[in-house]
Amino acid sequence: KTLYCELDLVEGETEKAEILGRDLKIIRRKEIPALRKELGIIFQDFQLLHDRTVRKNFEFVLKATGWKNKKDRDKRIEEVLNEVGMIDKIDKMPHELSGGEQQRVAIARAILNNPKIIIADEPTGNLDPETASNIVSLLKDITKQGTAVVMTTHNIPMLDKFPGKIGR
């Protein structure tokens, strides 16, 4: 359902809705965890778990997607937080972070499982221009690693800084 909304699909009006080789109209419940591993989602309002630290937010995602080994989880959490410059916030609660910091944490969460595609809903919508520019640079770097980024935005000038195909 979330993907239908994000991709502006209306049930009944779309013959086929395929992502990463899976038709969303007929996907089986047991196939969804595998799809989630291949997708990263960045929500406009971050969707961090407010009762958990950054580390615990990430542990929750990794456990839910099948990461059994604690050492592997800890290593991956540190890797992605270093990548977005947020390792010093690992034990902070979401309410202790600024909007830009929460967005970088949300991006780190989206790349935890090395997804093939990231869907970003207004990733710069609630941010000041400088922080927004930093977020766009970060997403641009992620695309250089082979991950596709599908982004919705009202910030048209920002799109000029982003590589790839742009639908307006």
What are these regions (language model features)?
Residues 15-23:
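Conserved ABC transporter NBD signature motif
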Residues 93-97, 101-103:
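Conserved ABC ATPase signature
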Residues 118-121:
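Catalytic Walker B motif of ABC-type/P-loop ATPase nucleotide-binding domains
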Residues 114:
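Conserved catalytic motifs of ABC-family nucleotide-binding domains
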Residues 129-131:
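Helix N-cap at the start of a conserved alpha-helix in ABC-type nucleotide-binding domains
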Residues 52-60:
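Short coil-to-helix segment of the ABC ATPase nucleotide-binding domain corresponding to the Q-loop/switch region
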Residues 7-8:
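Helix-to-loop junction immediately C-terminal to a conserved catalytic motif
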